[in-house]
Amino acid sequence: MGRFLNSIIPYASYEETCTDDYFVDKSLLIDELIPALSKKNRFLCITRPRRFGKSVMANMIGAFFGNVKDSRNIFQNLAISKSPNFSKHLNRHKIIYIDFSRFPRNCTSYEQYINRIQDGINQDLSLAYPDLTIEIGDAVSVSYTHLT
């Protein structure tokens, strides 16, 4: 479990969200995303205006697909549990989770912030895949090509 790769944060955050009195089940969005997993351009960017639930959606996606912790207890009573894709994809994927809403105190520029994220992802990849040669200073795209 790393800071970015296979982070526990999406699971913990979504588990807390599901217990909220005003929780609305939007888990069928996951079923809409599943076909994209088999595409060459399978990387997704979800954009919405402020306060439209982007973080909740990102946490839901990470909690569902991520394989850090069994999230069946969260999703078994949600709409996605009735999908034929439920068991096929629940907790079966590695995820990279980045929260852009928190700018660390020790970062003084956007460039430094992005470098910190790239270095963190590379460190996580190095720990998860010790047989690969991943340099901490490499761009994440370079590290990704080593994995595929």
Segments the model singles out, each with a brief description of its role:
Residues I9-D31:
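N-terminal pre-Walker A segment at the start of P-loop NTPase domains
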Residues I34-N41:
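Phosphate-binding P-loop
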Residues K54:
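Conserved lysine of the Walker
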Residues F64-N73:
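Post-Walker A helix-loop "phosphate-sensing" segment adjacent to the P-loop in P-loop NTPases
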Residues F75-S126:
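P-loop NTPase motor core
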Residues T145-T148:
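Conserved small/polar residues in nucleotide/adenosyl-binding loops
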